[in-house]
Amino acid sequence: MKISKLLPALLASSVAIVAHAQAPIKIGFMAELSGPQGALGQDQYDAFMMVVEQNGGKLGGVPVEVIREDSQLKPEVATQIVDKLIERDKVPIITGITFSNVMMAVHKKIVDKEVFLIGSNAGPAPIAGAQCSPYSFITSWQNDNQAEVVGVYANDKGYKKVIGMAPNYQAGKDFIAGFKRFRVS
């Protein structure tokens, strides 16, 4: 499904909430907005808000209120923010998570509360597998997919030795696992 259609579809399915409250649906937008990685999170936020503004503060015809939070690329900060968004702000949707280590820290907490999680960048492989939930949607990619293709390519070319390097966090580990999964040697 196209990204531009996913959020409006979710919001349209939440029409009963709006009908009773006649208030905007609150959306928690949590991303890494500060530090060296903050540019990516800020770009995500700017694009998201551009769509909201172009649609007169609505998504799928439903008024929305966006609550912006900075996880600082710290899983422990992100879990505190998620608690606040769910318990105090009562958001039915959280989006914007940029990095896989943050996604892994908050995923279970969000989906166990039956809050929709729309991941716009982070795509940890376990969330598409063992931890898959009908409450989570990743609109970008699954981390190990690209590396699986490279593993197949290395096999097809007959490469005997390959050196792999990746960052030591969830996404990097997913890349290495994906490569190994389709690398026969």
Model-derived segments and spans:
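Beta-alpha junction/loop-to-helix N-cap segments that form part of ligand/metal-binding clefts
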Residues: P24, A39-Q44, Q54, K58-G129, ...
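Short, surface-exposed alpha-helical segments at coil->helix boundaries
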Residues: G38-M49, G172-K180
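Short beta-strand segments enriched in small/hydrophobic residues
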Residues: P24-L40, I97, K161-M165
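Well-ordered alpha-helical segments embedded in enzymatic catalytic cores
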Residues: A47-M50, V77-I81, Q146-V150
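Extracytoplasmic ligand/sensor domains, especially the bilobed periplasmic-binding protein
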Residues: V91-S185
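Immediate post-signal peptide segment of exported/extracytoplasmic ligand-binding proteins
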Residues: A19-F29, G57-P63, N155-K160
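Gram-negative bacterial Sec-dependent N-terminal signal peptides
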Residues: K2-H20
